[in-house]
Design a protein with these regions (language model features):
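Short, Gly/Pro- and small/polar-rich lid/capping loops
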Residues: 1-52
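Well-ordered alpha-helical segments within folded domains of soluble proteins
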Residues: 21-26, 58, 280-284
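Short, solvent-exposed loop/turn segments at the edges of secondary structure
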Residues: 19-21, 54-56, 63, 89-93, ...
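Short helix/loop capping segments that flank catalytic or ligand/cofactor-binding pockets
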Residues: 34-37, 49-51, 69-71, 78-79, ...
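Structural recognition of the beta-strand scaffold that forms the well-ordered cores
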Residues: 25, 40, 59-62, 67-71, ...
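Long, histidine/aromatic-enriched segments associated with O2/redox biology
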Residues: 71-72, 130
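CBM-like, beta-strand-rich accessory domains located in the C-terminal region of large
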Residues: 78-369
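A structural connector/turn signal
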Residues: 56-57, 168
C-alpha cells in the first residue's frame, strides 16, 4: 500500500551529487518548478562510451524546467558525422577545449567528482577532467570510426594530449540562483584554452566590458542565465549559429504530422585565450526568471561582490589556484587554496540553525562493479 502521507519535491535537498556515476545537480526551488533555477553537471568515471557524451566537466543551466545554457547538437545517428563532430564531441558542450582539441571518445576519456558538499546555505562540487583529453585509443571506437568514416584527426578535434590538469569548482550561493564556477587549467606547454557556452532555443547576447565578458542566454519560458566571465589571460570572443558539421536527416525521420524533421541550428559561444601554460576562468552565473532583475556583479581587483556574497580568487597565471566565498550575514564560508592545507576545501554552513564545519578532500568513487 502507498504511504498515507504524500511527499513533495520541496523535501529534497537543494543539491545532490552522485559521484559514482559522476552527476551533480543544484536547485533553488524544487517545490515550485516554474520558479526553479537549476544547474546540472557531469564528470564521470565511465567516460564517453555507448550513449554517453564527451562532456566531462560540462554544466547546463535551466529555469522553469527549460534549458538555457545547454548541450548542443542533434542525435541524427550513432556514429554519423554530425553525431561524432557536433553532438558527442566536447565542442558541443559547456566545457573547455585545449588548443581547440576535444576529449577522447571511449571509457579512456573520463572525469570524476573528487569532492562535494550538499548544504543548506551553500553547496559545492568539483569535477576533474584531467584524464579526458587526447587521441582516441579505444579499439571499439577506432573500429566504429573506421566503419563510419570518422576522422580522428587534429582537423576534427583530436590530437596528442597537452593537458595536465582541468578542475572545475562549482559553488551554489544558497537560493539566489547564482552559481560560481572556477576553472583551474594547467597545460604541459603553452596552449589556447577555449571556454564554451551553447544555447538551443534563443541566441545569446555578448558584451565585452572592461574586465569581463558578459554572455546572456534565454529560454522560451522567461528564464535567463547571465554569465559574467572573468579570465586570467586575454581572450578573443566568437559566436556562431551553425554547427561544425551540419545535421542531415539521412534516416528520413518524420514528426507527428508525417513531415520530414528539419534540424535547427543552435548557438555556440567561445572565449579563447592567447597561448599560456596556466589559465583560470571565473564565471558568476546568475540564473533567474522575470520575477527579479539581474544581480549586480561588481569587481574590484580580485574581489567580486554579488549581493551579500563576496568572492575572492586568484585570477592570475601566477601562484596556486584559490577561491574564497563568504556571506557574513548568513555566516557562511567556503575556502579553497591549492597551496594550503594540502589543497583541502573548508566549508562553514548553517544547517537548521546550527553551524556546520566541513573539511573536504578528494574521495574516490565507490563502484559496485
Amino acid at each position: 500500500a502507498l504511504p498515507k502521507e504524500g511527499h513533495t519535491l520541496a523535501e529534497l535537498p537543494m543539491a545532490k551529487v552522485f559521484n559514482e556515476t559522476g552527476i551533480g545537480t543544484m536547485n533553488t526551488s524544487l517545490g515550485d518548478i516554474d520558479k526553479n533555477a537549476m544547474l546540472s553537471f557531469r564528470s564521470s568515471s565511465y567516460g564517453s562510451t555507448s550513449h554517453a557524451l564527451a562532456n566531462q566537466n560540462a554544466f547546463n543551466t535551466f529555469y522553469g524546467g527549460k534549458a538555457i545554457f545547454y548541450s548542443s547538437g542533434h542525435r541524427t545517428g550513432f556514429t554519423d558525422d554530425h553525431c561524432m563532430y557536433s553532438y558527442r564531441n566536447t565542442r558541443a558542450h559547456n566545457s573547455i577545449l585545449v588548443n581547440g582539441m576535444t576529449q577522447k571518445i571511449g571509457t579512456e576519456g573520463y572525469g570524476w567528482i573528487p569532492r562535494w558538499y550538499e548544504g543548506e546555505k551553500i553547496a559545492y562540487m568539483v569535477g576533474d577532467a584531467s584524464n579526458a583529453y587526447g587521441k582516441v585509443t579505444s579499439p571499439l571506437w577506432l573500429k566504429r570510426g573506421e566503419l563510419s568514416g570518422t576522422q580522428y584527426t587534429p582537423e576534427k578535434g583530436w590530437d596528442e594530449n597537452k593537458l595536465n590538469m582541468f578542475r572545475r569548482h562549482i559553488i551554489q550561493l544558497g537560493s539566489t540562483g547564482v552559481f560560481v564556477i572556477y576553472d583551474e587549467l594547467e597545460g604541459k606547454e603553452a596552449v589556447t584554452w577555449g571556454y564554451l557556452l551553447h544555447t538551443v532555443e534563443l541566441p545569446m547576447e555578448i558584451q565585452e566590458l572592461t574586465d569581463e565578458v558578459k554572455v546572456t542566454g534565454r529560454n522560451k519560458a522567461g528564464g535567463i542565465s547571465v554569465a559574467h566571465l572573468f579570465s586570467s589571460a586575454k581572450t578573443e570572443q566568437a559566436m556562431v549559429d551553425t554547427f561544425f558539421c551540419a545535421p542531415t536527416n539521412w534516416k528520413n525521420v518524420t514528426n507527428a504530422q508525417g513531415k520530414a524533421v528539419k534540424y535547427p541550428n543552435h548557438w555556440h559561444f567561445s572565449s579563447t585565450t592567447v597561448p599560456c601554460k596556466t589559465a583560470r576562468f571565473l564565471t558568476v552565473m546568475d540564473t533567474h526568471g522575470d520575477n527579479r532583475p539581474d544581480m549586480q556583479v561588481v569587481r574590484k581587483g580580485n574581489i567580486i561582490q554579488v549581493g551579500d556574497w563576496t568572492i575572492t580568487c586568484n585570477l592570475t597565471e601566477k601562484g596556486k589556484a584559490a577561491i574564497h566565498v563568504s556571506n557574513k550575514v548568513e555566516k557562511v564560508y567556503l575556502n579553497y587554496d591549492a597551496g594550503k592545507k594540502e589543497g583541502a576545501t573548508t566549508v562553514t554552513d548553517q544547517v537548521k540553525g546550527k553551524q556546520v564545519n566541513k573539511v573536504l578532500t578528494d574521495y574516490l568513487p565507490d563502484f559496485e562493479i
